[in-house]
From Swiss-Prot:
This is UDP-2,3-diacylglucosamine hydrolase. CDD domains: MPP_YbbF-LpxH (cd07398). One of its GO terms (biological process) is lipid A biosynthetic process. Pathway: Glycolipid biosynthesis; lipid IV(A) biosynthesis; lipid IV(A) from (3R)-3-hydroxytetradecanoyl-[acyl-carrier-protein] and UDP-N-acetyl-alpha-D-glucosamine: step 4/6. HAMAP family: LpxH. Its EC number is 3.6.1.54. It is a peripheral membrane protein. Hydrolyzes the pyrophosphate bond of UDP-2,3-diacylglucosamine to yield 2,3-diacylglucosamine 1-phosphate (lipid X) and UMP by catalyzing the attack of water at the alpha-P atom. Involved in the biosynthesis of lipid A, a phosphorylated glycolipid that anchors the lipopolysaccharide to the outer membrane of the cell. GO terms for molecular function: manganese ion binding; UDP-2,3-diacylglucosamine hydrolase activity. Mn(2+) 2 binds at residues 40, 78, 113, 194. Binds 2 Mn(2+) ions per subunit in a binuclear metal center.
Length: 242
């Protein structure tokens, strides 16, 4: 069994999500061969050198799961793209590129965070290209922690304000880009997060039936996609552990 989650946006202000995630790690995730976290795991990440006690606690919980035998794979999101090797060593997880092609249930599957698919959001795409540029990343990682904290708050506040103002189709994925990327990587199944719109979308890629599975965000409830002999099945669950 493989589990995939995304968009937990972990932060100290949401202890309900943290409790549910720690419960998830100690129970359901222990039964999995692998756990994939496809971005926006944390609400904000200013660098491994700025880890808080809360973030160390999360890393420790992941390490316990990893030590129990479950492989953990982590992908950057738009909120936590500064997660680096130090955190991954502490947490016992492997950092994946975006996109990442993997075999699941005997078929090639493409994993993405999903923000790079929102090509109609021109302003965000320009910002993303700048932020993910290796030179920009080097500059960001070497800024004083206080400066990074201010910048993170500014970017987060602007993102929230702009998202409220933009039309829903602009902040969702662009269908043509989905087809292009799936064709480029020669897959019939794409799994991503980012949009907070859990669903399974049927489409056609190069004349063949295909599907796009959108992971749910953890807010009013949690979400996990389970891949096993019965297929790809996603379901919500209550945040308060029973």
């Amino acid at each position: 069994m493989i589990l995939l989650i995304s968009d937990l946006h972990l932060e100290e202000k949401r202890p309900d999500i943290t409790r549910a995630f720690l419960h998830f790690l100690a129970t359901r995730a222990r039964q999995a061969e692998a756990l994939y976290i496809l971005g926006d795991f944390f609400e904000v990440w200013i660098g491994d050198d700025g880890m808080t006690p809360f973030q160390h606690e999360i890393a420790g919980a992941l390490r316990e799961l990893s030590d129990s035998g479950t492989r953990i794979y982590l992908m950057h999101g738009n909120r936590d793209f500064l997660i680096g090797k130090r955190f991954c060593r502490e947490a016992g997880c492997t950092l994946l590129g975006d996109p990442h092609r993997v075999q699941m249930n005997g078929e090639p599957v493409l994993l993405m965070h999903g923000d790079s698919l929102c090509t109609l959001d021109v302003g965000y795409m320009k910002l993303r290209r700048w932020l993910r540029n290796p030179l920009s990343l080097l500059i960001l990682r070497n800024l004083p922690l206080a400066t990074r904290q201010k910048l993170a708050r500014k970017l987060r506040n602007e993102s929230r304000a702009q998202t409220r103002m933009k039309a829903s189709e602009i902040v969702d994925v662009t269908p043509e880009e989905v087809v292009r990327v799936m064709g480029e990587y020669d897959v019939r199944t794409l799994i991503h997060g980012h949009t907070h719109r859990p669903a399974v979308h049927e489409l056609e890629v190069n004349g063949q039936p295909a599907r796009r599975i959108v992971l749910g965000d953890w807010d009013r409830q949690g979400w996990a996609l389970q891949v096993d002999g019965e297929g790809f099945n996603q379901a919500p669950f209550e945040l308060t552990p029973a």
